[in-house]
């Protein structure tokens, strides 16, 4: 399996049978083989996770499939791509024989994706995160904690080969909560931080915290756009 960090929350995963492109909206993409199907995911409608530029990929990739969150308006899909597009709801499962994907409800907008392909389990959180904001109304934060933990509890006992999880420095001292909660429910072999707004040191900061002692060796430190890994 090959993984490439594109930008923000965008990653490309290449398995034996398919490409999976998550939350792409800008920056240069690697070259794709036309022999493999390309699955393009958009977790929600926010412009840092979805752009109509993804539909331009259809011109070069005849085996393309779009899996979009339910909150993205269907009218934003060009006519030429409608038959290649599926919309996914929380709790819904799509399975085409190559890829199986399940949706989980985000604590912000849209969904998170749990993908099964070639015997691999791949999780992309989108904006499903523990958005605990300093200075926010205490009851709002309490509700957020409850909502996030209840949703990831639905994944309890699962094993993920890779998990793409938000690690947002804008949350201040609470930036780590989403990942810290997640690993209590899911056994993730490798954790790729995302949504860190160019602050690449957030992974290192988390790895230095006592709470990460049990999983810090699974956190991948990202240093630049276009960086790749083979697993």
What role is predicted for each listed range?
Residues 41, 67, 86, 102, ...:
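Hydrophobic/aromatic beta-strand patches that form the interior of the parallel beta-sheet core
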Residues 1-35, 84-159, 223-231:
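Core dinuclear metal-dependent hydrolase active-site scaffold
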Residues 26-74, 153-164:
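Active-site metal-binding motif and surrounding structural segment of the metallo-beta-lactamase
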Residues 31-32, 50-53, 77-79, 134-135, ...:
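Short glycine-/acidic-enriched loop or helix-start segments at secondary-structure transitions
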